[in-house]
Amino acid sequence: MNLYTDYKTNYQILNEALRASHSFDLVCRQITIQKRKSCLYFIDGLVKDEIMEKIMEFFFSVDDESFMESPYVFTENCVPYVEVDVVNNVDKIVTGVLSGMCALIVDGFSAAILIDSRTYPQRQTDEPEKDKVKRGPKDGLGETPVSNLALVRRRIRDPKLTVKPY
């Protein structure tokens, strides 16, 4: 399935595909760029905060309507990052977001802008020193819930994985 030029339709399609209301680590940040409704989708813990802040600054400072002509023109002139792709296939967008990329949809664009701003937690999951098991995965989680979730999301890139706060 491909995206449309209508923001509300695209927003609903991606929210359903990503199951946005079912996981607290999936961020759907609605913003306005040059008077157009837009939304950023990303997984908390898998994106670099500094890069997101810089990108958001650029988005809020867009003042030329001609940059909003197409996603390609917008990307070329307004996305201050090297690793960027314009994608209109919903499955590719979902895969990108679940693998740590940031997706931007903008009203009037029939494609999303994928920004590779991913970062992975600093350590690998290790087998715990105590409670060793003979079979199965040798993963141990011990940091904050966001870090633990990022480690799990890094391995399981499935929109059916839902996480609710307890």
Where in this protein do the model-derived segments appear?
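Membrane-embedded alpha-helical signal segments
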Residues: 1-166
